[in-house]
Design a protein with these regions (language model features):
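Domain-level signal for soluble alpha/beta catalytic cores
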Residues: 1-343
C-alpha cells in the first residue's frame, strides 16, 4: 500500500474519511486473499500513513509495517521528521516503523538513529542503491553490492532490525547485505514508553522533572462574546489569531474547545482542527464533554493529541479509554469517580 497521488484536505480536495475508505477497500481484499502482513511504504504524508493504519486496523489485526520517505533536509514532503512519525504511528498501532526509497544507505543512518531514540517497535530500512542518475536517457543506480552491504551494517548499528533494498537494488545487493549483517546483534526497541504529544511537524515531551509546561486555553468560546459571534458566522479568523498568539507567547500545547450554543459543535471542532494545524506547529489538546466530538477530532488530527479530560467514572472510562487507545491519544485523568471526589 502506498500514496494515492491525491492531496488531502485542506491542501487538496481528498477528504480524510474518503481516503480511509480507499485503504479499507484495499485492505479487505488483501486480507481476504491471505496476506500475512501489510507494508505501507514510500509514504510522504504522515496523515496518509494514519489513514492507512486506521483502515487496516478496522479490517483486521494483521501486522503493519509503515515506511516513509524523507527529503535531504530530514523531513517528508509535508514537513514531518522521523521522530514525530515514529511516535505517532507506533501509538496508532503500527508494528514496525521505518524509511525506504528516499536515498542511498549512507544517508539513511541519521534518520534511523533519530527513530531509535523513540521507537518501542522494530525499525526498518530499505535504501536505494544510491541516488538515481540519468545516463543516455536511462536511470541508473551506481552503489555496488559491497558498498551497499557495508552501509547496511551501519544501519543495523544505528538501530534498524529489518533491512532490505529499494530502487536499483538487485539480488546481488541483498545477498551481500545478508552476508554482512547475519551475525550482528538485533537492535531491541525501547521498553520504556515516553509521554510525548505531537502535531504533524513537531513533538513535545511531557517530563516529570519539574519543568513547567504551558497549555494555551484561549481557543474556547466560553465568556468570549466576539468569538461566539464569529463562530456562529462560520468564521475562524479569531481562532487562527489566538493560535498564533499563544504559540508566539510560549505555549507548548493548545487546548481546543468549541462548546457553545447555536453551532454544530462537531463540525466546528473538525474545522478548527484543520485551521489550527495548518497555522501552528503546537500539538493539540481536544476538549469536549461529548465523546463523539472527541473521537471525530482524534480521527482527523494529524498527530498524537491530548484528551482533556477523562474522569474515573465507569461509564465515561468505558467509552473514552477505547477511543484513546485506538487513536494513540494521551489523556488527562481526573480523580473523580462514581463515589465522588476523593478524600
Amino acid at each position: 500500500m502506498t500514496m494515492t497521488g491525491q492531496q488531502l484536505y485542506p491542501i487538496g480536495d481528498l477528504m480524510f474519511e474518503d481516503l480511509v475508505d480507499v485503504y479499507k477497500e484495499q485492505a479487505e481484499v488483501v486480507a481476504d486473499a491471505g496476506a500475512d502482513l501489510f507494508v505501507v511504504e514510500t509514504m510522504m504524508s504522515l496523515q496518509e500513513c494514519r489513514a492507512a493504519v486506521i483502515a487496516i486496523r478496522e479490517v483486521c489485526d494483521l501486522p503493519i509495517m509503515v515506511s516513509l520517505t524523507y527529503n535531504p533536509d530530514g523531513r517528508t514532503l509535508y514537513g514531518t521528521d522521523p521522530a514525530t512519525a515514529t511516535v505517532v504511528l507506533q501509538s496508532l498501532g503500527a508494528d514496525a516503523i521505518g524509511i525506504n526509497c528516499s536515498t542511498g544507505p549512507e544517508d539513511m543512518i541519521e534518520p534511523v538513529e533519530k527513530m531509535a531514540e523513540y521507537a518501542t517497535i522494530p525499525i526498518l530500512a530499505k535504501p536505494n542503491a544510491g541516488l538515481p542518475e540519468l545516463e543516455n536517457g536511462v536511470t541508473v543506480y551506481k552503489t555496488g553490492s559491497e558498498e551497499f552491504a557495508s552501509c547496511g551494517k551501519k544501519l543495523v548499528e544505528a538501530g534498524a532490525s529489518i533491512i532490505g533494498g529499494c530502487c536499483g537494488t538487485t539480488p546481488e545487493h541483498i545477498r551481500a547485505l545478508k552476508e554482512a549483517v547475519k551475525d550482528m546483534p538485533v537492535h531491541k526497541p525501547l521498553t520504556q514508553k515516553r509521554r510525548i504529544l505531537t502535531s504533524e511537524r513537531k513533538l513535545v515531551e511531557i517530563t516529570l522533572d519539574g519543568n513547567f509546561m504551558v497549555i494555551g486555553e484561549r481557543i474556547n468560546p466560553t465568556g468570549k462574546k466576539k468569538l461566539q459571534a464569529e463562530l456562529r458566522e462560520g468564521s475562524l479568523n479569531m481562532v487562527r489569531q489566538m493560535a498564533l498568539d499563544q504559540e508566539e507567547n510560549g505555549a507548548a500545547i493548545l487546548d481546543v474547545n468549541m462548546g457553545m450554543n447555536g453551532i454544530d459543535e462537531k463540525e466546528m471542532m473538525i474545522n478548527t482542527i484543520y485551521e489550527v494545524t495548518s497555522t501552528v506547529d503546537c500539538p493539540l489538546c481536544i476538549d469536549s464533554s461529548h465523546v463523539d466530538i472527541i473521537e471525530a477530532a482524534l480521527r482527523i488530527y494529524p498527530g498524537r493529541a491530548l484528551i482533556n479530560s477523562i474522569s474515573m467514572e465507569k461509564e465515561k472510562m468505558d467509552k473514552l479509554l477505547p477511543i484513546a487507545e485506538k487513536y494513540g491519544a494521551m489523556f488527562i485523568l481526573l480523580p473523580l469517580s462514581d463515589a465522588g471526589l476523593p478524600k
